[in-house]
């Protein structure tokens, strides 16, 4: 019987567990190549620390938070984890307080930063100077090559299946277009909620995945209103909608009274000012206030099998086990 060694895993006998081996696990010194996606208003230091305890990389969101609140979240993660542990902060370049948040990130010596919603290139030098790894989110092949050449430590390739602000190309098409030209760790994102998605991404050549929506149902995601969690549990694959596609600022979330009204206005030719006024404050209203009809609950497309709230550790264990089964089955195909 011929034994086929899977290079993604190595066996640690003393712990009786599988240790994953990808470019991303090496870069971030984590057990599993899973990054928890940053989510505005709700990704704090408690969730990020829980992700690290589970062997993954948690990310503190800066969207919706002041610079002082971001600092508090970073210090919460430090207090829980201690020094030398892996967590990150998301830097939203369109945010009005981006300079203040970036200064906090540098002052606190955050291990890594995910960068989105703007041109990441000018930020590499000051962040690298502070000893911080830079992982920009990219929506196309051209930008992926540019950020690699400019010194990005890794990239997150995010398909239109992702919740929140997203692009116009599916994840699989992006991976097909980008993977052949990228040597740094590539993280797949958008619509991945289980081990099947992780396995598919790794088989295609990604070094890891970013998952946001799955961790909305984590017990440690304590800032998300219970009503919003229940709305996600109740949702299925046809409940995912994109608002703002015609404006160039697409946002994906759960269909409800707000999204129906917005889409009616958008595709009736309403001016941008009307659409902006209509959507203002809806993210917070849905996520924090729990208004599931007049707020917008941001979530990705893969919703059908998100049916229960679990601790982060349990979620990760389920994902890891399913990934390993899928990869084992894939090895039998040829």
Predicted regions and their residues:
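Acidic, glycine-rich active-site loops and adjacent beta-strand->loop/helix elements
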Residues: 95, 160-161, 191-192, 214-215
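Active-site entrance/lid segments in N-terminal catalytic domains of soluble metabolic enzymes
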Residues: 16-185
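Short, Lys/Arg-enriched N-terminal segments with co-localized hydrophobic residues
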Residues: 1-17
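Conserved acidic functional residues
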Residues: 137, 190-191
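Residue-level detector of alpha-helix initiation sites
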Residues: 42, 192-193
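Conserved active-site-proximal phosphate/metal-binding subdomains
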Residues: 173-183, 187, 193-334
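Intrinsically disordered, low-complexity serine/threonine-rich segments
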Residues: 10-11, 156-158, 311
């Amino acid at each position: 019987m011929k034994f086929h060694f899977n290079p993604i895993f190595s066996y640690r006998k003393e712990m009786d567990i599988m240790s994953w081996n990808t470019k991303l696990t090496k870069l971030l010194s984590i057990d599993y190549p899973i990054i928890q996606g940053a989510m505005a208003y709700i990704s704090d230091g408690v969730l990020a620390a829980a992700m690290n305890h589970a062997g993954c990389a948690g990310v503190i969101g800066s969207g919706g938070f002041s610079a002082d609140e971001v600092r508090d979240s970073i210090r919460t993660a430090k207090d829980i984890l201690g020094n030398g542990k892996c967590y990150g902060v998301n830097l939203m370049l369109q945010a009005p307080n981006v300079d203040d948040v970036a200064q906090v990130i540098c002052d606190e010596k955050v291990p890594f930063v995910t960068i989105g919603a703007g041109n990441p290139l000018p930020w590499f030098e000051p962040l690298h100077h502070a000893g911080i790894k830079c992982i920009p989110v990219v929506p196309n092949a051209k930008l992926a090559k540019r950020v690699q050449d400019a010194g990005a430590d890794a990239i997150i390739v995010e398909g239109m299946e992702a919740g929140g602000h997203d692009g116009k190309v599916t994840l699989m098409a992006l991976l097909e277009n980008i993977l052949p030209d990228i040597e740094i760790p590539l993280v797949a994102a958008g619509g991945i909620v289980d081990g099947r998605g992780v396995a598919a991404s790794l088989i295609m050549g990604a070094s890891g995945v970013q998952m946001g929506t799955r961790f909305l149902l984590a017990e440690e995601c304590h800032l998300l209103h219970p009503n919003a969690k229940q709305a996600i549990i109740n949702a299925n694959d046809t409940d995912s909608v994109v608002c703002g596609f015609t404006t160039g600022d697409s946002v994906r979330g759960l269909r409800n009274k707000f999204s129906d009204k917005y889409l009616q206005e958008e595709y009736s030719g309403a001016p941008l000012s009307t659409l902006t006024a209509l959507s203002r404050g809806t993210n917070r209203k849905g996520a924090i206030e729990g208004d599931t009809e007049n707020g917008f609950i941001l979530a990705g497309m893969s919703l059908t099998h998100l049916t229960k709230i679990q601790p982060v550790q349990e979620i990760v264990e389920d994902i890891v086990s399913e990934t390993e089964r899928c990869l084992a089955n894939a090895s039998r195909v040829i």
